[in-house]
């Protein structure tokens, strides 16, 4: 019986394993094994549920609801009732500018204001900055082609929009540097709108009008039919819920933890076709007819080195940034801040180590044991300040408390803190990323049964990883059952 080995037990690998299991349940005569080198499943999704009732997210705390793969997966798993929406009654996000929290104006889509009055009245931008942003209506479009996000925003909307809006959004949410980000790989819609409308503001307004026209009478524009959804959503017990549900649905004897692959060689299988010999760190070997690499690109590069040095080289060209999160639980009686909002983001030029702060207990239900507490989640590190992700625990906590005191006036000691570190965990889609993907696909296609999946390639979000893992597994199953498919990324 032919076998597929899935390397990596994060959301990508578990989604791949589930897709293979469904293929087997549908009659495919194949086998599989998932190999996770750490003691736990979930990868960057890591929820700590404490005995006294806190739900603490170490990794991502939510997902974007506009991508359907997570809802499709939950429907198959029978866990649709576990989704929760954000508390949009207090839907305010702030940007820290000159040591003051300034509300992000209503109507901002991606990085573009689309509503006139909120844009005119906001104190986030100066009047010269607003006038420069309005010039987007008149600036000619450039020739088609990729450029960095910073170059694009600076050219179309001006430096102040870059510094006060685009920069904190991509640094606080994606841990990225707009000066190196490939626009074609991250926000291709912005390039498309410039070419189609000659202005991204015109393009965003046109898109908003189209959603208004398409929405059923009385419905919120863009809202899907069925249960309520907000732009950002999570799960009742934290994002770990989706990991737990995938494991619950898996064949437990085929999901292995503490199972690290030391190296892989390409060999001939018993049937004469290409196979892969996986050398495990415990000295054992596993022979598989197909391999789904559901690990970060730099890990995959190490494993394919013996097979394809050129492929390994290109995989290593995808940078990975490091970050850290610290969650702090405070007794409400000890603090005066009202926490009316989702949190704030910090531009690079403000000189803070904190990149973003989520007011978790306000944004999400069920994150604190009772209303006697408030919980804050802070992100540090990222592409331009990775050293901050490795500060010693006591120094990291000291820095965060000092900066929260400066921004929010909190001088009380937290009742509890939780620190999580993520070294080389956030792939960076730098300029030339799409060209690298073409090279990766070309080199991987030369090796039948090799499939690459995960956040390093075509989307870093949880729905992107689910889609990537599922697609790779379905292609692997089709390949092993005789419906040959080229290796894809």
Which ranges hold each PLM region?
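Conserved Rossmann-like nucleotide-cofactor binding loop
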Residues: 12, 40, 298
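Beta1/beta-strand and adjacent pyrophosphate-binding region of the FAD-binding site
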Residues: 1-12
